[in-house]
Curated annotation (Swiss-Prot):
The gene is MRM1. This is rRNA methyltransferase 1, mitochondrial. Present with 2760 molecules/cell in log phase SD medium. One of its GO terms (cellular component) is mitochondrion. It comes from Saccharomyces cerevisiae (strain ATCC 204508 / S288c). CDD domains: SpoU-like_MRM1.
Length: 412
């Protein structure tokens, strides 16, 4: 028995300590297998924020607050592509600012020019070679302040500028653009007072032997002041004067084109309704190519009285242009004449041609006081060459006026 016990003891000693530990654990687990049915306390390690009784988000913010923003950017953009893109956008933005600044520097004289315009509210700036030259020759322009030019002054201006003692000033082209509102100024502009047309009451009779007609200016106390106005004559074509009355033409370019055609074809004077026509601005002067300065132009404030008194006192005949759809109106019955009937009319009596705007024509109250009406036929309708289209149903008022003037002054 003793020998058997010794043998078991020796075998036990031969087992490794790890085996002894496993054996003890196994025996322990066997002995406590019943305890597994009871709640056991967890042996897992607590988190750091739980140990400190702190919120997880707050703990992370506090723990990593020392990490530099550069390290965060490096982690978000490890290859530097985002940084390069941001720098490129910044460079483009800076270049755009430089370009804008450079562009604005070209207009640094804008304030000077605007100040110049504000300092001279009683002046206007006539521009264009012919318009400026005609304005210098016009005695009605009694005050010329300065002649502004870019480059060189045309040779034909030198003598008249010296005679009138007009100050000349060399300016840059942009300043001329501002003063003329970007019109075609031909590098020259004249600072001068606006035209002040005479207001008249009516047209009087005329003396064909001396080729002069009388006009009656309206004075301050509504008194009529008579004046003589010479008119041009042509052999076998024009014995009596021809005037032009403009009603409700508001486009300055149309006014200028009409004045140019009237002067070229031989009209003696123009009368305008002050209240509803475009004023005689530098745009009108430029469009007329200087004819505004050469042709007598008058204003009337009472057109109906002007028509009536001119017919009674001077024997003037008023011929009104009218639209194609106006032939059925009562006041045109028996008064409509053709274009051919206008030929040589100024050999028989003094005539005032009345024209209106392109949309409505002459006002009805003026039509009712007119002696005759004339219409320009559309594209040879009578011959059947062309049918009228609603898109193009009329001529420009300046073209229509030129055709009517030419027919009146042509003797066939």
């Amino acid at each position: 028995m003793t020998s058997l016990t010794n043998a078991v003891f020796k075998r036990y000693l031969a087992v490794t300590p790890s085996a002894h530990q496993a054996l003890k654990t196994r025996i322990k687990k066997k002995s406590s297998s019943f305890d597994k049915f009871f709640p056991q306390q967890s042996n897992s390690r607590k988190k750091q924020w739980e140990t400190l009784n702190e919120d997880k988000a707050s703990w992370f913010k506090r723990k990593y607050a020392h990490v530099h923003a550069r390290e965060q950017d490096r982690a978000a953009d490890p290859y530097g592509k985002k940084k390069a893109h941001v720098e490129k956008l910044k460079e483009i933005k800076n270049q755009a600012k430089l370009n804008q600044k450079s562009h604005k520097s070209k207009f640094q004289n804008k304030d000077i020019a605007l100040k110049l315009m504000n300092d001279n509210p009683i002046f206007e700036y006539v521009y264009g070679t012919n318009s400026v030259y005609a304005a210098l020759l016009n005695p009605s322009r009694n005050c010329h302040s300065r002649l502004l030019y870019h480059g060189t002054i045309p040779s034909k201006f030198l003598q008249i500028v010296d005679e009138l003692k007009v100050t000349t000033e060399l300016v840059d082209k942009h300043r001329l653009n501002l003063l003329t509102n970007y019109g075609v100024h031909n590098n020259i502009a004249l600072e001068t007072k606006p035209l002040q047309p005479v207001e008249i009451a009516y047209l009087g009779d005329m003396d064909t032997s001396s080729a002069a007609l009388s006009i009656h200016e309206l004075g301050f106390n509504n008194e009529n002041i008579p004046h003589e106005l010479p008119y041009g004559t042509k052999t076998d074509a024009k014995k009596f004067p021809l005037g032009l009355y403009l009603d409700e033409i508001t486009d300055p370019h149309n006014i200028g084109a009409i004045i140019r055609s009237a002067y070229f074809l031989g009209v003696d004077f123009i009368v305008m309704s002050r209240r509803n026509c475009s004023p005689l601005t530098p745009v009108v002067s430029k469009t007329s190519s200087g004819a505004l300065e050469l042709l007598p132009i008058f204003y009337v404030d009472k057109p109906l009285e002007f028509f009536t008194k001119s017919q009674e006192m001077g024997g003037w005949t008023f011929i009104t242009s009218h639209l194609a759809n106006a032939t059925s109106e009562k006041y045109t019955v028996g008064k409509t004449i053709s274009m051919h009937d206008l030929n040589g009319l100024c050999n028989e009596l003094p005539v005032v041609l009345v024209v209106g705007n392109e949309s409505q024509g002459v006002r009805t109250n003026l039509k009712m006081r007119s002696d005759f009406f004339v219409e320009i036929p559309f594209g040879g309708i009578e011959k059947g060459n062309r049918a009228p289209e609603p898109i193009v149903d009329s001529l420009n008022v300046s073209v229509a006026t030129a055709l009517l003037i030419d027919n009146i002054l042509t003797c066939k």
